Swiss-Prot record:
Chain residues that bind Zn(2+): C402, C405, C420, C425
Active site: K112
Catalysed reactions, as listed in the record: NAD(+) + (deoxyribonucleotide)n-3'-hydroxyl + 5'-phospho-(deoxyribonucleotide)m = (deoxyribonucleotide)n+m + AMP + beta-nicotinamide D-nucleotide
Primary gene name: ligA
Protein name: DNA ligase
């Protein structure tokens, strides 16, 4: 080994050790000047001797340009959300459910960092992939940006065949204040809060910008530990620290839920004492075996819950109450407020839901009110301050005619909502289009409300189906578009034709049919044509489809306007069937593990093939594993497969199974 390569290796070890001491142990051993000097020397040597540059070098944290878009990546296991607890009663109920399934319980309580979930994958000890949460199953790969975060090790301190780690990316308060100050001086729009700033920073196409944002990362979960079974969540946190990750030190262990409740009360008062935003606490069953026994619901683990801090309340004035007409015709009263700063952003409006809510709270135009963000997200009026009334306040009355189209407004028996009776109401059509193009529906990027307003005003569209007839020459003159934007929009519209049945059903805006129901109906019927024929009785027999939804779906497809709309979509070439793989499902029902270094394909590609042919690409070996595909340097998974008598295939043997 040459002197240069030895020096480069020594610098890397010094820098990574300094990162571990600073971010992993919170015990810095170098001054900023000493650290910078080492890093600059490493960068210089690698530039002079590029033959020694490696992807896991600390110098690679400075960033560079990325491709024009982030590729999608399927998570090893779904990133489920947590159920929420808002008070002691919710926590007691959680404890009751847990103890009904397991006896002695110990809880770990961790800070709920207000950032964004990031999943990391290490192979042969090196970071190979990092991704956002996305929809929980598929996220965006942002590896290059994540490599700029010093708290994320590029190489593990202990060798591991494969390690999947989850944690929270965040922006410290100090970094956020500096960033907004720089943006203000540059005349750029400010970020509303550190969470939004962190999300925007991680989606930069130039990772050098991400590197400048000084983001942090706290790891809290391991999916595939290589050194035997980790028996508890506290053991997981210790293991993560040993591997070089930054782990939030502010976690506590309790044996009684009453202790947890008391601690939650203490933390409400201390929530602002940290250099980063927290919006609650996460309570987990400590014992991993008990976690497995408790299992999961369709959307969340039964062994964990998020305690959400009470919302911050701020006083302001109701300057006006304005009606907004939604896509189903509901008239929603919105309070226009004197702008105030609450829970990280400036609020100027708050929903009042319906007339019953206004009457119950006695909200009047001109009232002083307390507002908060429900779940620290959605602004709402909590109560009025009657002692501040002057007598000049005005009582709000719901209009008898729709403010958008002047059609009669009705309130059906048993409902709190007032509705516009016209299905051709411009507001309903506008909101229906906005919903149709939204991310979880047809996902037409670049088609925001402002562009939709222009298209409607210019007479280029009347409904969402007309989007598929738009032409380039008609789009270019529009104010918010141009040649490049028009090209991108037309491509996004064309791509949306292949979204499939479930997003299309959701995008239709059928009353009571959300995203989950769209998937259920798509799976049940397979084609739009079959769904159109469905009767109320058979719809009600489908799990999770109640009488109200069944009635709504049947009525929707009985309308002549619905048939006309769907025919326009068909003529445009929109796919109206569930997206089934054309490949034979040779691995259907099989759990398959891929391990080691492969020669012909990379591991992610093999896992994708397994899923395309009907199998499940699992991250760990168990008795349920059908077989293991093993490459070179296969570690503990190969040993466990042999121990359990699980068949082991080489890469070539796996290739021979494929059609």
């Amino acid at each position: 080994m040459s002197d240069v390569s030895q020096r480069i290796e020594a610098l890397r070890e010094q820098i990574e050790e300094a990162n571990y001491q600073y971010y992993g142990l919170d015990q810095p051993t170098l001054s900023d000047a000493e650290y910078d000097a080492l890093l600059q020397e490493l960068i210089r040597l690698e530039k002079e001797h590029p033959e020694f540059l490696t992807p896991d070098s600390p110098s690679q944290r400075v960033g560079g340009y990325i491709a024009k878009e982030f590729p999608k990546v399927r998570h090893a296991e779904a990133l489920l959300s947590l159920d929420n607890a808002f008070d002691a009663g919710d926590l007691l109920e959680f404890d009751r459910r847990v103890r009904s399934m397991v006896a002695e319980v110990e809880y770990v309580v961790e800070l709920k960092i207000d950032g964004l979930t990031v999943a990391l994958t290490y192979e042969d000890g090196a970071l190979v992939r990092g991704a956002t949460r996305g929809d929980g199953e598929v996220g965006e790969e942002i590896t290059a940006n994540l490599k700029t975060i010093p708290a994320i090790p590029l190489r593990l301190r202990k060798q591991a065949d494969r390690l999947d780690v989850r944690g929270e990316g965040y922006m410290p308060k100090g970094s956020f204040l500096r960033l907004n100050q720089e943006r203000e001086e540059a005349g750029q729009p400010l970020f509303a809060n550190p969470r939004n700033a962190a999300a925007g920073s991680l989606r930069q196409l130039d990772s050098r910008i991400t590197a400048q944002r000084k983001l942090g990362y706290f790891a809290y979960q391991v999916l595939t530990p290589e050194e035997g079974e980790l028996a508890s969540q506290t053991a997981v946190l210790d293991y993560l620290k040993e591997q070089g990750f930054s782990v939030n030190p502010e976690y506590r262990v309790f044996s009684a839920i009453e202790e947890v409740i008391a601690y939650c009360g203490e933390m409400v008062e201390k929530r602002h004492n940290y250099p980063y935003d927290i919006d609650g606490l996460v309570i987990k069953v400590n014992d991993i075996a008990q976690q497995r026994e408790l299992g999961f619901t369709a959307k969340s683990p039964r062994w964990a819950i998020a305690y959400k801090f009470p919302a911050e309340q701020v006083e302001t004035v109701v300057e006006d109450i304005v009606i907004r007409v939604g896509r189903t015709g509901v008239l929603t009263p919105t309070a226009y407020l004197t702008p105030v700063f609450v829970a990280g952003s400036t609020v100027g409006r708050a929903t009042l839901h319906n007339l019953d809510n206004i009457r119950a709270k006695d909200v009047r135009i001109g009232d002083h009110v307390l507002i908060q963000k429900a779940g620290d997200v959605i602004p709402e009026v909590v109560k009025i301050l009657p002692e501040k009334r002057t007598g000049g306040e005005r009582i709000f009355e719901m209009p008898e005619l729709c403010p958008e189209c002047q059609s009669p407004v009705i309130r059906e028996e048993g409902e709190a909502a007032h509705r516009c009776t016209s299905i051709t109401c411009p507001a309903r059509q506008r909101e229906a289009i906005i919903h149709f193009v939204s991310r979880n529906a047809m996902n037409i990027d670049g088609l925001g409300p402002a562009v939709i307003y222009q298209l409607l005003e210019a007479g280029l569209i009347k409904d969402a189906a007309d989007l598929y007839a738009l032409e380039y020459d008609a789009l270019v003159p529009l104010e918010r578009l141009g040649k490049k934007s028009a090209e991108n929009l037309l491509k996004a519209i064309e791509d949306s034709k292949e979204r499939g049945l479930a997003p299309l059903i959701f995008g239709l805006g059928i009353r009571h049919v959300g995203e989950k129901a769209g998937k259920i109906l798509a799976q049940k019927y397979g084609t739009m044509e079959d769904l159109e024929k469905a009767q109320v009785e058979e719809l009600q027999e489908i799990p999770d489809v109640g009488p109200a939804m069944a009635q709504s779906v049947a009525q929707f497809f009985q309308q002549e306007s619905t048939h006309h709309f769907l025919n326009k979509l068909r003529q445009a070439g929109v796919v109206m069937s569930a997206q089934h793989s054309a490949k034979p499902q040779i691995f259907a029902g099989k759990s398959i593990v891929v391990t080691g270094s492969l020669q012909r394909w990379d591991r992610h590609y093999v896992e994708t093939m397994i899923e395309e042919f009907g199998g499940k690409a699992a991250s760990s070996v168990s008795k349920k594993t059908a077989f293991v595909v093993a490459g070179e340097k296969a570690g503990s998974k190969l040993a466990k497969a042999k121990e359990l008598g699980i068949p082991v295939l080489s890469e070539e043997e796996f290739a021979e199974l494929l059609p």
